[in-house]
C-alpha cells in the first residue's frame, strides 16, 4: 500500500496520491431541491461542545454531511471511531486517507459519556476502514457497544461498519456484542465499484449482511447507496433484489454530492419523483423500510427510523400469525 501522503490542497486534509493525482472534475451546481438551510442554534452549539470536550470525531463533520445543522440542532450525531484517517481511498469519500494512528483506549468510555450527556435514545456509531488492524477494529467496535450499554442501558445502538475484508472472525465479534441495527453500505451498484469503491468487493458486502442475519436474526440489517454516479435504473433494482436475497430489512437511497474537484463527478442529479419511485418499488420487494430522497443519508433520522423498523416488524409478525 502506498503511504506517501499529499497535504497540498485547499482543505489541508491528508490526500492519498490516488486522490491527489486525479484530474479535476467540474463540480456541478446543485439544483434547488438539494440546497439546505444552515441555521446556527443553541442545540447545534451544545452538540459541538460535547463532541469537542470528549475529543470525539463525527462522520457528520468529516464527510461534510449536508444534514449536520438539522441533526446537531436536535442533539443527534454519528460518532466515528478508530480515528479520522482511513486506510482506503474511495472516490466518493471526503474522509482523510493515510496511515492511521493507534487506537485510543479511552474512546469507548468517551463515546459512552457523550451519549449520556446528550441524552440520546438512539446512537449511531461508524468508523473509518482499518485494514491495518488484524481484526479490522472489530474488538474496538465491541468495546464501544459494551461501554454505551453500561452507561445508557435504554439507548438503542446502531452501527455502520466497514466490510472487514479478509478479517476472519471479525464479523462474529461485532455481532456477538449485539447492536440493535447493523448497517453496512453497498454505496453503489457493482459496475461502479472499480472506479468508486476499488478497495471493496460488492458480493463480499452482500455476504457480510447475509451473515449477520445467520448469526443473529433479531438484529435489524440495513444498507445504503448513493445515486447520480452514472448507474442505470435497472442496476438499482437488481441491487435491491440482491439485498433482499440477503434478508436486509432497511435500505437508504440518497443523492451523491461531490466533495471536491478531485472526487468522482456527479453524473446527474436524480429528481425527487425518481427517489419516490425507488421507495415504492423497494417496499414491494419486501423491505421493512425504505428511505429514499435527495438528502437521505445512512444516519439521517436514524432514531425515528428505528421506531418505524420495530413497528414494521411487529406488524409483519402479527400478519403472519393471523
Curated annotation (Swiss-Prot):
Residues 72-288 form the Radical SAM core domain. [4Fe-4S] cluster 1 binds at residues 60, 65, 71, 299. The keyword Membrane does not apply. SUPFAM superfamilies: Radical SAM enzymes. Residues 1-22 are annotated as: Disordered. Its EC number is 2.8.1.8. Keywords: 4Fe-4S, Cytoplasm, Iron, Iron-sulfur, Metal-binding, S-adenosyl-L-methionine, Transferase. Pathway: Protein modification; protein lipoylation via endogenous pathway; protein N(6)-(lipoyl)lysine from octanoyl-[acyl-carrier-protein]: step 2/2. It catalyses: [[Fe-S] cluster scaffold protein carrying a second [4Fe-4S](2+) cluster] + N(6)-octanoyl-L-lysyl-[protein] + 2 oxidized [2Fe-2S]-[ferredoxin] + 2 S-adenosyl-L-methionine + 4 H(+) = [[Fe-S] cluster scaffold protein] + N(6)-[(R)-dihydrolipoyl]-L-lysyl-[protein] + 4 Fe(3+) + 2 hydrogen sulfide + 2 5'-deoxyadenosine + 2 L-methionine + 2 reduced [2Fe-2S]-[ferredoxin]. Transmembrane segments: none annotated. One of its GO terms (cellular component) is cytoplasm. The keyword Membrane does not apply. It is found in: Cytoplasm. Residues 1-12 have a biased composition (Polar residues). One of its GO terms (molecular function) is 4 iron, 4 sulfur cluster binding. [4Fe-4S] cluster 2 binds at residues 86, 90, 93. It holds the Pfam family Radical_SAM. Belongs to the radical SAM superfamily. Lipoyl synthase family. HAMAP family: Lipoyl_synth. This is Lipoyl synthase. It comes from Brucella ovis (strain ATCC 25840 / 63/290 / NCTC 10512).
